[in-house]
């Protein structure tokens, strides 16, 4: 099987799994055959669900169903949008003792705290089945994240992926994924000398991102990004729901938004109705018995809809204006230089949104991208680019760093005072991954522990109270050489998380080493020796010379490089290592429990279907095939088993108990099914045998009628007639046995034997025709060879006759020439005699 990679877009409304196979990007379908999997997880008394199954039970199981779990990743209690996100949650978010956000959920009769990372770990674990079911086993997996994600949220996403057991090669900003999806498949449209500048508006279920990218044949770059966390389709739905609820409350005195189950029902309905306003100017809301038995009926025009959602559209307009301003001020690019504006996301289809885009950007919107799938496609392409198994066209791609990252370290000045210095490691908008090297001489280093810290720029992200991202302690040896230095590599990785990658101590020192010094005077004397001296004398001379060699010490400059230990400060944010391992183990155990419960449910459903099906057949299809004692015993066994399946006995969820309890029923019932099926198959195969006899007989008769063109001879017809005669006899005997057989016993003839006989009849009859055809072909071949040989012999004879005729002509010509010569000689002799 060829290698494949996976690109996973985790959206607020749903997720899409893309794969790259045979140089084609396509979508992996869910187990419900949908292209998108709802981002929802739920728990019940027996199992955990996600996606479509979790969404289906949202109304009835809302206290244990978490929608938009990815929106809670990494959120801290003091963040300004905590309360805003809470109004979209069915379950109240809480914080544990370590400050981790999560939800108290009752699972299997026990209420427990589940962190958002563990909930997303469940989601990843379940969605992984979508591609493993297709036989895809790969570590080349890329997951998308919103561009505004801080290090807190990025770290939380990575932990959720770790909990699920997925091996993720990288996180990718959604702007990068969209740019790849747009640019990589359009490289042929770009030029080398001029960049194409394209704007993208991504308005989804919960947030909006507007960004610009530049494209040419060699490079793609995201140059400007602006985000709004709360600006999407669900804000539209919430405002409409609030408006309709106010009208309903004024009329009936009850507020639908105050009851969670009714609120969910209303929001779901409005979400469906809202989409109709993209093509219609008016729609009706009709919900039977919404609350306290009262029906909801409301006519909503597009004009009123746009008026109600004005707070959201105002935010969107402000974001568009900010994007244009940043493009001009920071990138020095005017709107007229922008090639086009592409739309992405589920909410950009809203007419008022498209009008605002046209008004601000002065361009018609383009719809060349798949709004719901382009991010997953970009993730998949990025996974292929990073995989060693695929060769992707050579070009550079630049991501966009959302917040400036700074590094802080201690520094000893020349006067001996220690100061804390902070440098910019990665500016906002810079590409990553990226590293910087810092080298400190011994005099500049703080003794023993060297503390390095990474921060966000406070001016860019004012609402983040704790802007510390990471911290490391490097233990520098107290005793080092005088001439020594330490080189640090500070690095921002592909996930946009900073770290201290390496720390190397370089020591320069002088060391005395032994050096051999040879008596050069003796060597000169040896050179002047006469050649006539014997070899033995030379050897003795050499030994004396070695004795005179002296060992002296010489100073040599050397360098020693030592890698220093880098210790990360434990759990500045994120989950501590030990707790994370427990969550990973817990997810594995619960996944096994889910798999076992699926097997139990499947087995339980299989038993129920067996009972329902058998009850219907006992007095109908099985009437002639069931023994009296079986007819008496089997219903009792089924009734007892059925009552047990719907009892409160916990053993109904035990696979061994299900198998044990149902054993007696299958022991009595399976033989009945076996008899019935064998008799039915025997009848079917008898009919097929009769059909085969008729087909072959008709074929033989046609050949007999066409006696001038048939390839069959008398022996062939005799063979076929015998096959048909034997088959008729076999069919007659089997039919008689079938008609006389006792249906309450197994058939007297095995239906497999009749099937095999029928197949052999076809094969043997075909072999007669094939053999006849071979014989005819062989006779034809021999005849052609004889004719060819005869023709060759005739041609050879003609050639020989021509050769003989030619020889005769040549011989005749020679005789005539000789006769002519003799006549000439006679004339010459006669003339000579006359002269004399």
Predicted regions located by residue number:
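Oxyanion-binding/catalytic loops of NTP- or PPi-dependent enzymes
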Residues: 1-84, 92-95, 108-116, 122, ...
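Short, acidic/hydrophobic/Gly-rich beta-strand patch recurrent on exposed beta strands
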Residues: 104
